[in-house]
């Protein structure tokens, strides 16, 4: 549904911090999104985390979920960063890690809108590998004008 060129229109992040490769499902009725991050051994963070046993840092899994949620928020508003608005990741609740994410894994990112108070948005997010949950959290984002 969204290739990397369209994703770059909705996220201000760039290499090495753009963590969404593809969006395959965007459901406005269910207010949800499904996106993918292909985890390659060539990711720069594997040089130090950990050289002999590479594991994707948990904070980057959280960031990937937040980026998917950000795309959903922009799409729900029919807006883009170029319009002068950004979403900042400001917190997480109910965070759980269940298994490590390794080079060669495909991270499935799912986010569902659960509420909004003024400029604060909440999303229920989870990340899966091979259909198994690896991380889940409620992600909070703040909508800010540039």
Curated annotation (Swiss-Prot):
CDD domains referenced in this protein's UniProt entry, alphabetically: FabZ (cd01288)
Catalysed transformations (reactions): a (3R)-hydroxyacyl-[ACP] = a (2E)-enoyl-[ACP] + H2O
Keyword flag Lyase: yes
Keyword Lipid metabolism belongs to the record: yes
BP terms from Gene Ontology: fatty acid biosynthetic process; lipid A biosynthetic process
InterPro entries xrefs: FabA_FabZ, FabZ, HotDog_dom_sf
Entry superkingdom: Bacteria
List of catalytic residues: 49
Keywords annotated in UniProt: Cytoplasm, Lipid A biosynthesis, Lipid biosynthesis, Lipid metabolism, Lyase
GO molecular function list: (3R)-hydroxyacyl-[acyl-carrier-protein] dehydratase activity
Entry's localization field: Cytoplasm
Protein family per UniProt: Belongs to the thioester dehydratase family. FabZ subfamily.
Job of this protein: Involved in unsaturated fatty acids biosynthesis. Catalyzes the dehydration of short chain beta-hydroxyacyl-ACPs and long chain saturated and unsaturated beta-hydroxyacyl-ACPs.
Protein name: 3-hydroxyacyl-[acyl-carrier-protein] dehydratase FabZ
Organism: Pseudomonas putida (strain W619)
């Amino acid at each position: 549904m969204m290739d990397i060129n369209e994703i770059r229109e909705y996220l201000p992040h760039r290499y090495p911090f753009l963590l969404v490769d593809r969006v395959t499902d965007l459901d406005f009725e269910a207010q949800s999104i499904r996106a993918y991050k292909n985890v390659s051994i060539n990711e720069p963070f594997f040089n130090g985390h950990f050289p002999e046993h590479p594991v994707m840092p948990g904070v980057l899994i959280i960031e990937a979920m937040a980026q998917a949620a950000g795309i959903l928020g922009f799409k729900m508003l029919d807006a883009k960063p170029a319009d002068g608005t950004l979403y900042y990741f400001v917190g997480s609740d109910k965070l759980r890690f269940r298994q490590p994410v390794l080079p060669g894994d495909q991270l499935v990112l799912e986010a569902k809108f659960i509420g909004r108070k003024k400029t604060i948005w909440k999303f229920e997010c989870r990340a899966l590998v091979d259909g198994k949950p690896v991380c889940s959290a409620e992600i909070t984002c703040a909508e800010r004008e540039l």
